[in-house]
Amino acid sequence: MSLPTYSKLNIVILAAGKGTRMNSSKPKVLHALAGKPVLQHVLDTARRLNPSSIIVVYGFGGEIVPQALPADDIIWVKQAEQLGTGHAMQQALPYLEPDARTLILLGDVPLLTQESCTQLLTQQAALCLLTVSKDNPSGYGRIVRQGDAVKAIVEHKDAAEAQLAIREVNTGIMAAENTWLATWLPRLDNRNAQQEYYLTDIVAMAVADGQAVAAVQSNDEWQVAGINSKQDLAALERVYQGRYAARLLAKGVTLADPSRIDVRGELTTGRDVEIDVGCVFEGQVTLADNVRIGPYCVIRDATIGAGTTLAAYTHIDGATLAEDCRIGPYARLRPGTVLSDHAHIGNFVELKNAQVDSGSKINHLSYVGDATVGKQVNIGAGTITCNYDGVNKFRTVIEDNAFIGSDSQLVAPVTIKAGATIAAGSTITEDAPADKLTMSRVRQFTIENWKRPEKVKK
């Protein structure tokens, strides 16, 4: 009998486990991989399959998991007691649509791809398993076959000696018709060494009911690897980063050392981009053509224009840089900062919510916050925009072609008019007129007969 074609897809993600070996009070599915929770990776894959519903079964940690990942398209189902994967699916059963298929994913298997899920779902069988062959299958449920047909999955602790020699193992990921799940799940029991309700027992039920059980064997062990310890988490992090680096190299990005780059979000690159060692990219980052990133830079939610260079140890967060800018080393650009073409921001300069127009330079040891800087402005070393009175923040405006001498304090709200020059060491509290020299400093004088104090002998 041919199997029906289902237009609806339910996805159930099992995410109730404690993860004892993580040695953490945090549910293991909330630990970060590449900058986002492990469970978020699984949710992202699930959403790409366009299911009619996503059901997440959670348990350990209580409401921490749904609170950490709020979303309108998720049905959260609590497994109050963690009594096994079969018990978890029993909790999800009332939310499954009768005329749909269900894809069962694991919340601690973050590298599974959409392609593998699709391959599983296209199998014409009431039940289909995703399996993998392991050199060391210890701890995994063994796939027991009769010829090519899957007859059962035997958990490691329940396996006979001959079954322990089997290398093909269950990944825990499967797809099934909901009409059959409604028949099999209520029949599960906990008569086994672990006294848990094994979801894998539905394989034997399917065979007993005369239903063929299909299996798709993955050739990528990492793609189906779960996280049970910090060692597992660290290993998968390096796999993820290594694969991301390989994709960047394939696009033509030059990486000084592919093993020393971390992407914790999405990195979009143009042509002839160069990235030195130790760089971290977080959130949504875009690097246009011919961008050069020096060693140990951290870039978060930023757009870097063509031809721009970031020297070593530069931090960019929530900023937009236009073309041919020169930044760093040791510069920090905070959220709201926008640089126009050919801006220069030098060492130990911090910008926050500052707009710097084309050709302007802030080359040394300065803080410019809540400021608008015009074209061709030069801001000397040690300049500070004093933007905060302890309660409110105020804005500084520096118009085109102004020159700010070193060690100046601009007390906002204040405007430095076009072409104005501020003498070094000035504290400016009022607007400075255009094309004039403004200064505010104590007159220098010398005490002729002064002597240094002498040390008192005790």
Swiss-Prot record:
UniProt binding sites for UDP-N-acetyl-alpha-D-glucosamine: 14-17, 28, 79, 84-85, 141, 155, 170, 228, 334, 352, 367, 378
Alphabetized UniProt keyword annotations: Acyltransferase, Cell shape, Cell wall biogenesis/degradation, Cytoplasm, Magnesium, Metal-binding, Multifunctional enzyme, Nucleotidyltransferase, Peptidoglycan synthesis, Repeat, Transferase
Annotated GO CC locations: cytoplasm; membrane
GO molecular function: glucosamine-1-phosphate N-acetyltransferase activity; magnesium ion binding; UDP-N-acetylglucosamine diphosphorylase activity
Pathway linked to the protein: Nucleotide-sugar biosynthesis; UDP-N-acetyl-alpha-D-glucosamine biosynthesis; N-acetyl-alpha-D-glucosamine 1-phosphate from alpha-D-glucosamine 6-phosphate (route II): step 2/2; Nucleotide-sugar biosynthesis; UDP-N-acetyl-alpha-D-glucosamine biosynthesis; UDP-N-acetyl-alpha-D-glucosamine from N-acetyl-alpha-D-glucosamine 1-phosphate: step 1/1; Bacterial outer membrane biogenesis; LPS lipid A biosynthesis
Record: residues binding acetyl-CoA: A381, N387, Y388, S406, A424, R441
Annotated stretches, region: Pyrophosphorylase: 1-230
Reactions listed under catalytic activity: alpha-D-glucosamine 1-phosphate + acetyl-CoA = N-acetyl-alpha-D-glucosamine 1-phosphate + CoA + H(+); N-acetyl-alpha-D-glucosamine 1-phosphate + UTP + H(+) = UDP-N-acetyl-alpha-D-glucosamine + diphosphate
Annotated disulfide bonds: none
Pfam families given in the database record: Hexapep, NTP_transf_3
Cofactor mode of binding and number, as noted: Binds 1 Mg(2+) ion per subunit.
Cofactor: Mg(2+)
Catalytic residues in the record: H364 (proton acceptor)
Positions contributing to Mg(2+) binding: D108, N228
Region (Linker) residue spans: 231-251
Region of interest (N-acetyltransferase), residue spans: 252-458
Entry EC number(s): 2.7.7.23, 2.3.1.157
Subcellular location(s) of the protein: Cytoplasm
One GO BP annotation of this record: UDP-N-acetylglucosamine biosynthetic process
HAMAP family reported in the protein's UniProt record: GlmU (MF_01631)
PANTHER family: BIFUNCTIONAL PROTEIN GLMU, NUCLEOTIDYL TRANSFERASE
Similarity comment text for this entry: In the N-terminal section; belongs to the N-acetylglucosamine-1-phosphate uridyltransferase family.
Self-association state and partner proteins as the record states: Homotrimer.
Function of the molecule: Catalyzes the last two sequential reactions in the de novo biosynthetic pathway for UDP-N-acetylglucosamine (UDP-GlcNAc). The C-terminal domain catalyzes the transfer of acetyl group from acetyl coenzyme A to glucosamine-1-phosphate (GlcN-1-P) to produce N-acetylglucosamine-1-phosphate (GlcNAc-1-P), which is converted into UDP-GlcNAc by the transfer of uridine 5-monophosphate (from uridine 5-triphosphate), a reaction catalyzed by the N-terminal domain.
NCBIfam families: glmU
Name listed for the protein in its UniProt record: Bifunctional protein GlmU
Organism: Methylobacillus flagellatus (strain ATCC 51484 / DSM 6875 / VKM B-1610 / KT)
Gene (UniProt): glmU
